[in-house]
A protein has these predicted regions:
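A short N-terminal interaction module
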Residues: 1-25
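Conserved S-adenosyl-L-methionine
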Residues: 27, 33-142, 206-209, 219-220
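Short, well-ordered loop/turn elements at secondary-structure boundaries
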Residues: 53-54, 89-94, 128-129, 133, ...
């Protein structure tokens, strides 16, 4: 294992030293895709019998029982008939991999049956079955496919930590995007994408977690740098597999090309084989506006979202709106306006540092704003203080000059010294984890509780320092009541909903990383009337009035029906 981790293995050496694999398909994340879903994916990828498929190359990286392979073989057969070819002309048209010998044997039998049923001879069918299907690990193949036209399939859904240690290390060495607590399918995306020729297409049905979570960031960065996201189809409620799965699946169609327009589709539970042709036709038509049927909705974006950050989620119309706002407006956190998003002070020992009374020098008690102080929508201080070890210059105080503070900390020395921050800096055992910024205390700030169902900005006019369960916004230019009105609106809520993880009960995390995603107009571009309307709505905690004013400010009055969620109703939460 250490040898694998410590050096790059030669291609053949890598697989020969690895642990034997289980013959149980379930342990390999094998879930069978329904035939109509397979046909939908092949249609969307452009792997269709009207093309001369014998001249192209398609890869199925984890063929399992052959759900995709059978359909692909049938299409190659039909294509050869249509183009007056021998089926043997297609000997290089398909390459399928699987780790398990029984799956390889089953797939070869399936291919033979498909081809003989189509009228090809048994020797021809057997030759192609042998050529098309091979036992091997797609992620570690010493001669990986290159310059292929299609990579299609349903890659295995297995946590990387559930793979034997030596094989896991080999996967990480072969696939740099597989970081953190990655799932195995991330490697299939990476290897599949890198196999494509210019213009080649990858089409997978797979869990959609990688689009938003931390371990998918390097894959998102790879896609953004060299590939085009042509299509995403959310299939959360669709019966796409032969058995129930816990993951939320999506179909993604990626192309080795510069990013162009992208289509986003959301399906409903009723979406089935009868609806697939209509969906394919609407996508091929490149409709510039949103399309809606009884079983799906679709919208066309002018481009996809870039970088390694989480890709937004939501209805196609919501995503189209967010894409438009991203293009037209600057980010909330903006150096040109001195607008900054931050988090309150973390102590590592709130029972010691956060109190309503402590026998210390009075100047060491810093008024602290808490989540409960924001509950009503008006800032109402609950009387909590931070027993503050930092002076007015942000330097740790010398306890020899503060006997009462020293005595207080020493009474709690056991709790303070067992914190990680104290272990790293024994001479500063009484520090908080975060340094206090003295300049922040008297600044007006908008406060945001960490967890809430709807966005909940509250104005602290100054004099308090935020606790770590509060995020804050300060600005050199914005009137914070006007900005507070914008951030109380359904537009701001839509940004957070698109990027944040929603917890049980509908609670959202209003963390700095999500608040920074919000786009806002330039302060000077807002009319006096709209400034007054936003400030009045903020003071009244009227999120519906705030949303109405925000729609005008953003120039999206016609899209008010997209904001029927929690932030669109009267009052805060």
């Amino acid at each position: 294992v250490k040898a694998i981790a410590g050096r790059q293995l030669a291609s053949g050496e890598m697989t020969s030293v690895l642990s034997a694999v289980s013959a149980n398909p379930v342990e390999h994340g094998e879930v069978f895709t329904r035939r109509w879903i397979v046909d939908l994916i092949l249609d969307l990828a452009g792997f269709t019998a009207d093309r001369d498929l014998a001249t192209l190359v398609a890869v199925e990286p984890a063929c399992g029982g052959g759900a995709f392979l059978a359909a692909m073989a049938g299409r190659v057969s039909a294509s050869c008939r249509k183009h007056d070819r021998s089926i043997l002309d297609a000997k290089s048209a398909l390459r399928a991999f699987d780790l398990l010998g029984p799956s390889v044997a089953a797939s070869r039998t399936l291919v033979r049956n498909v081809l003989t049923d189509d009228g090809w001879s048994l020797p021809e069918a057997s030759e192609l079955a042998q050529a098309w299907v091979q036992q091997g690990d797609f992620l570690l193949d010493p001669q990986p496919p290159v310059n292929v036209d299609f990579v299609v399939g349903n890659p295995p859904y297995v946590r990387l930590e559930d793979v034997p240690a030596d094989r896991m290390l080999a996967y990480r060495a072969a696939c740099p995007t597989m970081t953190g607590r990655s799932d195995l399918y991330v490697g299939f995306y990476e290897r599949g994408l890198k196999s494509l020729r210019p213009g080649g297409v990858l089409a997978f049905i797979c869990a959609d977690r990688w689009m938003r979570n931390q371990y998918g960031r390097h894959l998102r960065e790879l896609v953004s740098s060299s590939y085009s996201v042509d299509l995403t189809i959310s299939m959360h409620d669709v019966d796409a597999f032969e058995e129930q799965v816990s993951a939320y699946p999506a179909i993604t169609v990626l192309r080795r090309a510069a990013q162009g327009a992208s289509t986003v589709v959301d399906t409903r539970r009723s979406f089935g084989p009868q609806d697939a042709p209509e969906l394919v036709e609407s996508i091929r038509a490149n409709a510039p506006t949103a399309v809606s049927s009884g079983s799906f909705t679709a919208a066309r974006l002018t481009h996809w979202f870039t970088g390694e950050g989480p890709w937004p989620t939501g209805s196609p119309s919501r995503l189209a709106l967010i894409e438009s706002l991203n293009d037209r407006f600057p980010l909330l956190e903006d150096r040109s306006t001195g607008t900054r998003v931050g988090i309150g002070v973390a102590t590592g020992a709130d029972k010691v540092f956060v109190t309503k009374y402590a026998d210390v020098e009075p100047r060491r008690l810093l008024p602290l704003s808490m989540v409960r102080d924001t509950a009503s929508g008006k800032f109402e201080w609950s009387g909590h203080y931070l027993v503050n070890p930092w002076d007015e210059d942000g330097v740790l105080v010398d306890l020899s000059w503060l006997p009462r503070l020293r005595a207080y900390y020493e009474r709690h020395a056991v709790a303070l010294k067992r914190r990680h921050v104290a272990g790293r800096r024994p001479g500063q055992w009484y520090r908080t984890i975060d340094r206090v910024d003295p300049a922040l205390v008297d600044r007006p700030k908008l406060l945001f509780p960490d967890m809430k169902s709807a966005i909940h900005p509250v104005l602290d006019a100054g004099g308090y320092y935020p606790h770590h369960n509060l995020y804050y916004i300060v600005s050199d230019v914005w009137d914070l009541r006007v900005l507070g009105g914008l951030l109380l609106s359904g537009v701001a809520q839509a940004f957070v909903e698109a990027y944040a993880v929603r917890m049980r009960g509908g609670t959202l995390r209003f963390q700095a990383q999500y608040l920074r995603r919000i786009r806002v107009p330039r302060p000077g571009s807002i009319s006096l009337d709209d400034r007054a309307a936003l400030a009045t709505a903020f003071d009244a905690r009227d999120s519906q009035a705030a949303t109405e004013a925000a729609l005008r400010v953003y120039g999206i009055e016609a899209m008010g029906d997209l904001f029927g969620g929690p932030a669109a109703g009267r009052g805060g939460s």
